[in-house]
UniProtKB/Swiss-Prot annotation:
GO molecular function, one term: glutathione hydrolase activity
The species this protein was found in: Arabidopsis thaliana (Mouse-ear cress)
Active site as annotated: T54 (nucleophile)
Tissues in which the UniProt entry reports expression: Expressed at low levels in embryo, roots and leaves. In mature plants, expression is restricted to vascular tissues of roots, leaves, flowers and siliques.
Family: Belongs to the gamma-glutamyltransferase family.
Residues binding L-glutamate: T72, N74, E93, D96, S126, S127, G147, G148
Highest rank taxon of the organism: Eukaryota
Pfam families in the record: G_glu_transpept
Gene Ontology BP term (one): glutathione catabolic process
Gene disruption phenotype: Mutant plants (Ds insertion) display reduced inflorescence height, silique number and seed yield.
Full protein name: Putative inactive glutathione hydrolase 4
Gene3D superfamilies to which the protein is assigned, alphabetical: 1.10.246.130, 3.60.20.40
Length: 191
């Protein structure tokens, strides 16, 4: 997908596709119960950045005030720098930008995504997905996750467990998870 900072990259087509029933039905038709294909079969063109060092918290108080907060230093010990005035470890979120490189002869790894190349003032893509769910203007849930590339799938699975499988909040979070991102072409099972 050609996702990037919308102040620098036109993401209207990607967003339109992500919200399109026809696009989703087209992807669904490509799913084969017996085989996973290369990423380009599903429309994947670019490599994904793997990040670490993330925490998430979700809070809803007795008055229905809500917070969904994801924080990251990205890699272990972030930028390896500590602020002398605050003692806070600084993040290295700059590592989430795609880095231009020469063409690779390795056909199993897609090239970096140009929409996520670094530019002054630009924000890198991130898998952080702090989410507040509302219905008719009222808070129904607060959800998010940590785990780098597992964040989006984890957040989605907790959401589905709670709203569609009718699990309680703790069971929704503790339930085993399945993860597949096409590269590497391996299914991960977490329990």
């Amino acid at each position: 997908m050609n996702l990037g900072d919308p102040d620098f990259v036109d993401v209207s087509k990607v967003i339109s596709d992500m919200l399109s029933t026809n696009f989703a039905q087209g992807l669904k038709k490509k799913i084969n119960d017996n085989k996973t294909f290369d990423p380009n079969y599903y429309g994947g063109r670019w490599d994904q950045i793997n990040d670490h060092g993330t925490s998430h918290l979700s809070i809803i108080d007795s008055e229905r005030n809500v917070v969904s907060l994801t924080s990251t230093i990205n890699s272990y010990f972030g930028a390896l720098m500590l602020s002398p005035s605050t003692g806070i470890v600084l993040n290295n979120e700059m590592d989430d930008f795609s880095i231009p490189m020469k063409s690779s002869s390795n056909l199993t790894v897609p090239p970096p995504a140009p929409a996520n190349f670094i530019r002054p003032g630009k924000r890198p893509l991130s898998s952080m997905t702090p989410t507040i769910v509302l219905k008719d203007g009222k808070v129904k849930a607060s959800v998010g996750a940590s785990g780098g590339l597992y964040i989006i799938a984890g957040t989605t699975e907790v959401f589905l467990n709670y709203f569609f499988l009718k699990m309680d909040p703790l069971s929704s979070v503790l339930a085993p998870r399945i993860y597949h991102q096409l590269i590497p072409n391996i299914v991960s099972y977490e329990n």
